[in-house]
Amino acid sequence: MVGVTPEPRTLAEKVWASHVVRSADGEPDLLFIDLHLLHEVTSPQAFDGLRLAGRRVRRTDLTIATEDHNTPTGYADPSYQSRRGDLLTITDPTSRTQIETLRRNCAEFGVRLHPLGDENQGIVHVIGPQLGLTQPGMTIVCGDSHTATHGAFGALAFGIGTSEVEHVLATQTLPQARPRTMAVNVVGDLAPGVTAKDLVLALIAQVGTGGGRGHVVEYRGEAIRKLSMEGRMTIANMSIEWGAKAGLIAPDDTTFGYLRGRPNAPAGADWEAAVAYWRTLPTDAGATFDSEVTLDASQITPFVTWGTNPGQGASLDASVPNPEEFATEPERAAARRALEYMDLAVGTPLRELTVDVVFVGSCTNGRIEDLRAAADVLRGRRVAPGVRMLVVPGSAAVRENAEAEGLDKVFTEAGAEWRFAGCSMCLGMNPDTLRPGQRAASTSNRNFEGRQGRGGRTHLVSPPVAAATAVTGRLAAPADL
């Protein structure tokens, strides 16, 4: 109607509204999906469902697959060509079957696949952005809980189950109930040496692992705006760790600079048109959220988890907490169990905790910026005796980039293992695992019991803290060296 001012909307509301195919009272909205990412673990049954129903993949052009979760990252022969199609290195029969099945399914249904040995193979949430597939204003799904990573670009991205994977393969749509919205207002600036990983761990410790449940979150504030795209992806990646369905950051010149010139990004006049549209996406002045959270970035110091969920964390300056000092009995009980599993004594300074393994990698912190940060700390130093350090790039392209910069030499000369791309020690689904009782400092996203191997004990940290820990053999920040 002429003269009517549109209702102010949030970023998430704009993206949602532009993708509604069908909406009816009392029913979920039917959303069009712009990009569907696949890997070997959650897709086999979905393809079986298509096969049984005699259906095809509706939009193969919007469907991309890669091999990442089960893939080994250590090879005797360092040549990429030796890895092309080579399943002999996958010794676990279940893992090998899943990889073989993904290859057959992609060949049968015409889905683009980046397998082991491919120059674009890697962790699904690393290759999407680096290939320019992830773009502002998109809807993106994957059968993986850390799909929220792509929200760093202003996309509505979330993980789905295997039955939903089949639905998207068959229809390129997905029924979804409209979620509530939440703003995370990050005030102040991060101090030098404090990273995006520290910020998001501090946030989860503040709000708890259920603080975002049922919400699509938007991260806002000057501290967020000052982050690189790699830092923003770290923040968005861990949205699920505090219960949020998705986590978005409004696109800006930093976003556009990252995307410009990437293989699948718009070019020429299409680029100008895309940027003009993307600039309309940020939340309107006057738009309201269902709830808001405030975090003071200036008060954050290097952070580490002490327990068995990402919310059980504290400043590296702190000591192991006393469970009896928590506010509620469920929190006290969870802390008691965590300390028992982690074999920690109340009051022990966190800096006194020794580690057996250090892992740098994952879809949280396996990008080139993360590897540079770790290398800056390790340069000219050695990994402590008795400590094993694995550095695993998030993609083959990240690995190639790092080697072009000489980072691989920094790592290997320090005594770390320089590996091939994959999910690696983030989860115990491939050969890179902890042994029972081993303690690790890890740049991944989850520290659940047994997450990195049965009986393994995980402390989540940033790449600089991981590198400093490798040098000292105990939890440490670079300033401690």
UniProtKB/Swiss-Prot annotation:
SUPFAM superfamilies: Aconitase iron-sulfur domain. Its EC number is 4.2.1.33. The lineage of its organism: Bacteria, Bacillati, Actinomycetota, Actinomycetes, Micromonosporales. It catalyses: (2R,3S)-3-isopropylmalate = (2S)-2-isopropylmalate. It is an enzyme of class 4 (lyase). Pathway: Amino-acid biosynthesis; L-leucine biosynthesis; L-leucine from 3-methyl-2-oxobutanoate: step 2/4. Binds 1 [4Fe-4S] cluster per subunit. Its cofactor is [4Fe-4S] cluster. Residues 434-465 are annotated as: Disordered. PROSITE patterns: ACONITASE_1, ACONITASE_2. Keywords: 4Fe-4S, Amino-acid biosynthesis, Branched-chain amino acid biosynthesis, Iron, Iron-sulfur, Leucine biosynthesis, Lyase, Metal-binding. Belongs to the aconitase/IPM isomerase family. LeuC type 1 subfamily. The gene is leuC. GO terms for biological process: L-leucine biosynthetic process. It comes from the Bacteria. Heterodimer of LeuC and LeuD. CDD domains: IPMI. This is 3-isopropylmalate dehydratase large subunit. GO terms for molecular function: 3-isopropylmalate dehydratase activity; 4 iron, 4 sulfur cluster binding; metal ion binding.
